[in-house]
């Protein structure tokens, strides 16, 4: 699919400060972000041509479950997913500010499971680290910060290639699960930084809302519920399904098969349909098809 050229006219910025570097910088940044978004859209349009038979993903809603430690609730899933063949995991800590402390925590956990862990922030060449990785784990934190770092380091296409073409196992937790999907449009996080595009890795053809929270019928809080926000997202045209993963749940994707695992169920939102409940063990393989609808 070849998209036509997109011509963007950057509007003149309001005079909020003296003319000078700020205006030029802001206009330049806006133009670059718009052009990057167009490039990402063209890249996404080609995704359907990539074979998915080798794809292996473990998409976890949350890293820590109430009453437990870091990755405790899913550690057996991780061990079964990686198996004995993988010896070391490449960790991507970009979602948190303190990457050193984050990598230390992740390393201690994976070493307790029998795996080595190298953090990508310690590498002089992040792209080369991805190309050599036996497995990739992207941790949680702020999804906007994470996606911006992936774009800034030129890692979107290298990670896609390793996972979709080379069959390298991918583990995502929270924000790491968000960026595995088509876009981060349904994240819960604040946009504290601005990635060039909301389009993400596109390892699956739908969106996920990690930490999905059911409405509290006894609450007096007047803010929008998670469900209302997702329904607002689906008021926009051509928006993909959204899988609300409750804390304690995870999605295992092997090739063209997707299965809900963990301790809790999930809630599925498909544009134009009522939300549906799904228990652990549910088969979500139909979501992996382009233009997925209810089975």
Enumerate the language-model features and the residues they cover:
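C-terminal and late-domain segments of enzyme folds
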Residues: 2, 48-85, 97-104, 108, ...
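N-terminal chloroplast transit peptides
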Residues: 1-33
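Catalytic nucleophile loop
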Residues: 137-140, 163-183
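Glycine/threonine-rich flexible loop motifs
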Residues: 143-153, 219
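A glycine-rich, hydrophobic loop/mini-helix early in the fold
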Residues: 92-93, 97-143
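Short internal beta-strands
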Residues: 90-93, 208
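Short glycine-rich anion-binding loops that position phosphate/pyrophosphate groups of nucleotides
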Residues: 63, 141-144, 176, 213
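Catalytic-core regions built around general acid/base machinery
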Residues: 153-167
């Amino acid at each position: 699919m070849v998209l036509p050229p997109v011509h963007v006219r950057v509007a003149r910025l309001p005079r909020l400060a003296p003319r000078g570097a700020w205006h030029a910088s802001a206009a330049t940044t806006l133009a670059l972000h718009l052009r990057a978004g167009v490039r990402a859209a063209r890249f996404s349009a080609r995704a359907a041509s990539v074979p998915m038979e080798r794809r292996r993903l473990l998409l976890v809603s949350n890293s820590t479950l109430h009453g437990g430690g870091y990755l405790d609730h899913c550690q057996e899933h991780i061990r079964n997913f990686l198996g004995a063949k993988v010896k070391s995991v490449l960790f991507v800590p970009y979602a948190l500010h303190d990457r050193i402390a984050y990598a230390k925590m992740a390393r201690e956990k994976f070493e307790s499971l029998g795996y080595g862990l190298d953090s990508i922030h310690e590498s002089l060449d992040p792209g080369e680290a991805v190309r050599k990785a036996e497995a990739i784990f992207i941790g949680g934190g702020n999804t906007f910060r994470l996606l911006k770092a992936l774009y800034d380091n030129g890692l979107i296409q290298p990670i896609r290639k390793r996972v979709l073409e080379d069959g390298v196992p991918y583990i995502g937790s929270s924000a790491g699960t968000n960026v595995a999907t088509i876009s981060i449009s349904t994240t819960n996080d604040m946009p504290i930084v601005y990635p060039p595009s909301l389009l993400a890795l596109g390892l699956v053809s739908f969106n996920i809302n990690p930490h999905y929270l059911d409405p509290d019928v006894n609450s007096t809080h007047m803010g929008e519920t998670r469900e209302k926000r997702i329904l607002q997202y689906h008021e926009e045209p051509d928006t993909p399904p959204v899988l609300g993963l409750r804390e304690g749940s995870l999605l295992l994707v092997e090739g063209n098969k997707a299965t809900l695992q963990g301790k809790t169920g999930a809630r599925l939102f498909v544009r134009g349909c009522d939300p549906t409940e799904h228990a652990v063990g549910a088969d979500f393989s139909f979501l992996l098809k382009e233009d997925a609808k209810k089975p």
